[in-house]
């Protein structure tokens, strides 16, 4: 693999001929990132990080700023697109064994954590009712940390409750973290090009490679065009599809919403958090639901890289996908039967996938007589 990264600027990167549509999501994520930075910049020009003015400034953007409604909707729905693409990107990595390129995988999961933090801070900025209460519930989890919890929470809030200093620092963090995402993305791409992309067969593709441009770049454009078309269709016809009705009311610390929940892309982690009736246990499970992705490269025992010819792993993978969807759905429901037991069962199944990987790999080696 050439070490001259300048080649990548001209699309001369050698790529396997047989990579499928599932490899398109990297370029789609890059497009989402560019869109978010651009729309975010124009929104930041008109936004006011003050608890008395934040909600009004969002109304001002959508009503008075030329194309402000489009910028605001593109930014909000673009975030959902970003998470759809990144979850598919990670699922592809799990299915085809891309995680065996350890440095690339580690940088990717770090990117995911940074992205989740950025999205969380961004959700608080409109200072709507759900923004305020979601921020209160999630930041309050820091109090579960032994000894340091109360001090950490007070330090994060900038006071003894969520107030003006909290909003100011959340806006500052939401503005600065995308630059960290851009840096990590560059690192992710450099590390990927060091070893090269994997492929659906999991074999060494060095004998059969073609330049990224024009072959794969044109293939990427198809799905990219579809994504942009879908994004603008939702912005034009269903702009509030991902919004919570409570967030159309200004934050009121005296009135608690009937059901506090974050944006849909955090619901799987929130569902795992709620399924454990203990604050510290729930907070640990929430953190572990993401952090467990770091251990995957070290628990791979199968001799074959992708799951294409590994039926047991395939079964567990599709169980994970359905589990992810079920936890997300259950997290939108109130904490009452039967949703409690559904959340607890699916949370156990979620972690079972990661813990069973080494055993399944070993069993599949035995089934195929691969020593």
From Swiss-Prot:
Membrane topology per record: Multi-pass membrane protein
Residues annotated to bind heme b b562: 75, 174
Alphabetized Gene3D superfamilies for the sequence: Cytochrome Bc1 Complex, Chain C
Needed cofactors: heme b
CDD domains associated with the record: cytochrome_b_C, Cytochrome_b_N
GO biological process: mitochondrial electron transport, ubiquinol to cytochrome c
Residues involved in a ubiquinone binding: 193
Keywords of this entry: Electron transport, Heme, Iron, Membrane, Metal-binding, Mitochondrion, Mitochondrion inner membrane, Respiratory chain, Transmembrane, Transmembrane helix, Transport, Ubiquinone
Described function: Component of the ubiquinol-cytochrome c reductase complex (complex III or cytochrome b-c1 complex) that is part of the mitochondrial respiratory chain. The b-c1 complex mediates electron transfer from ubiquinol to cytochrome c. Contributes to the generation of a proton gradient across the mitochondrial membrane that is then used for ATP synthesis.
Quaternary structure annotation from Swiss-Prot or TrEMBL: The cytochrome bc1 complex contains 3 respiratory subunits (MT-CYB, CYC1 and UQCRFS1), 2 core proteins (UQCRC1 and UQCRC2) and probably 6 low-molecular weight proteins.
Note, other: Heme 1 (or BL or b562) is low-potential and absorbs at about 562 nm, and heme 2 (or BH or b566) is high-potential and absorbs at about 566 nm.
UniProt similarity note: Belongs to the cytochrome b family.
Protein name: Cytochrome b
Source organism: Antaresia maculosa
């Amino acid at each position: 693999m050439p070490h001259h990264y300048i080649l990548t600027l001209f699309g001369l990167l050698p790529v396997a001929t047989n990579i499928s549509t599932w490899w398109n999501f990297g370029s789609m994520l890059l497009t989402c990132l560019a869109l978010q930075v651009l729309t975010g910049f124009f929104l930041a020009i008109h936004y006011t990080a003050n608890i008395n003015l934040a909600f009004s400034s969002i109304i001002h953007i959508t009503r008075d700023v030329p194309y402000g409604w489009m910028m605001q909707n593109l930014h909000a729905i673009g975030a959902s697109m970003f998470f759809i693409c990144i979850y598919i990107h990670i699922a592809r990595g799990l299915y085809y064994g891309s995680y065996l390129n350890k440095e690339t995988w580690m940088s990717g999961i770090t990117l995911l954590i940074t992205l989740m933090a950025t999205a969380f801070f961004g959700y608080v900025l409109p200072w709507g009712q759900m923004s305020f209460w979601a921020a209160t519930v999630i930041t309050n989890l820091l109090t579960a940390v032994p000894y340091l919890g109360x001090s950490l929470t007070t330090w994060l809030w900038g006071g003894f409750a969520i107030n003006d200093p909290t909003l100011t620092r959340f806006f500052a963090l939401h503005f600065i973290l995308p630059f960290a995402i851009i840096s990590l993305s560059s690192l992710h791409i450099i590390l990927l090009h060091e070893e090269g992309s994997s492929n659906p067969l999991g074999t060494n593709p060095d004998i059969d490679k073609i330049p990224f441009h024009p072959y794969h770049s044109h293939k990427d454009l198809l799905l990219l065009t579809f994504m942009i078309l879908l994004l603008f269709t939702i912005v034009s016809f269903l702009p509030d599809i991902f919004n919570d009705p409570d967030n159309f009311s200004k934050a009121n610390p005296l009135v608690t919403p009937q059901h506090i929940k974050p944006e849909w892309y955090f619901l799987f982690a929130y569902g795992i958090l709620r399924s454990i009736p203990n604050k510290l246990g729930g907070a640990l499970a929430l953190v572990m639901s993401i952090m467990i992705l770091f251990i995957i490269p070290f628990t791979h025992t199968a001799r074959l890289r992708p799951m294409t010819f590994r039926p047991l792993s395939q079964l567990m993978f599709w169980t994970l996908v359905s589990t992810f969807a079920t936890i997300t759905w259950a997290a939108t429901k109130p904490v009452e039967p039967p949703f409690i037991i559904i959340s607890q069962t699916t949370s156990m199944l979620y972690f079972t996938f990661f813990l069973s990987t080494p055993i399944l790999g070993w069993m599949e080696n035995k089934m195929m007589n691969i020593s």
